[in-house]
Amino acid sequence: MKILIIGHYPPHKGGVANHTNNLVKELRKKHEVHILTYGPIKPRKFEREFVHQVKVPQIFGLRGILFTFLAALKTIKLQKRTKFDVIHAHYVGTTSYAGILAKEKLNAPVIVTAHGSDLDFMSNLPLGRYFVKKSLSKSDLVIAVSHHLQKKAISMGATKIRVIPNSIKTIKKEDAKREYITFIGALTPYKDPQTFIKLAKQFPHEKFLVVGNGPLRTDLEKRAPKNVKFLGYKEDVGGILSKTKLLVVPSLREGFGLVIIEANSLGVPVIGRAVGGIKELIREGKNGYTFKTFEELVEKVEILLSNKKALKMGKIGKTISSQYSWERIGHLIEESYREVLGERNDNCNKHARKGRLEENQSSCEIY
């Protein structure tokens, strides 16, 4: 198959960029994969032929909108030259709507993946909500990374939807003493790092680690007790998780919570707020605990610090995380492509039997 991925991609950073990067690596084992992303960027040498970009100015509030319309035009242009079988847009809103706008001119289905912050953030903006609803209702298939997002997408107009979770690349464990209670994530309000700092004050004899950057960092550093260490953003979390005995995820909302699977893969138990995708990933008392109040959080931390249950949870977590390999997730996504293409072929055959193939030719051709 020839596949076009639309969305953030390295050197861009963040969850979506990491996801598309790993998905592309997996799909390229069997298929020709191209990427259309935000520019200007300097693609890696080995993939310059396959990475296309839309250069958009850094204008706050307008960059995403400009990308939408310019990326739609670029997609149509690329399709005429390359003839993709599938267009797969990541992040519902400005990115996905680029594919939807181009869809009438394309000879390929458009698939959209909802990652979490897209439905939460974009749907709160008037124009963003329009982009989201159109993308969900007009796409050939919506992929949600959790059942929580699936329900939300259906409530906003998605009709054809499938749950395929995020995945993780293999993380190498380093030989290190597990001595830290760790937070990994952006230092933004919805990740609620303030609760983590508050927790550190309750356990003055424990070592706490904050991994990530964001607008709240300066204020957090001022308020943090001496037992908290700030490391900033780290691309590779393997070394950090190898030193971690407990991961805390206090996010106020979360579409999936990839860091939970990453921690589990190295045998680290997780305590996370009982919201969104976090509730789906943490199996109570098996690979961690969930909490609703700060008092519950303190209680769960005390339980894991005071007995050997954390060691047992770590072993169970490793087993659970093995279900989220990129080989498996990549296969499920590839399977979705084939299902959508198969349905289009079926529709084409129906039109042919009714003698209407010619008038429906543009929507039936599969290259």
What are these regions (language model features)?
Residues 112, 122, 129-172:
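Donor nucleotide-sugar binding/catalytic pocket of nucleotide-sugar-dependent glycosyltransferases
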Residues 284-285, 289-295, 303-308:
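Conserved acidic donor-binding segment of nucleotide-sugar-dependent glycosyltransferases
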Residues 309-323:
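A short, well-ordered alpha-helix in the C-terminal region of glycosyltransferases
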Residues 233, 252:
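Aromatic "clamp/platform" in nucleotide-sugar-dependent glycosyltransferases that forms part
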Residues 260, 269-272:
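Short hydrophobic beta-strand element within catalytic cores of glycosyltransferases
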Residues 1-41, 201, 326, 364-367:
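N-terminal subdomain of nucleotide-sugar transferases
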Residues 4, 174-203, 208-211:
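Conserved donor-binding/catalytic core segment of Leloir-type glycosyltransferases
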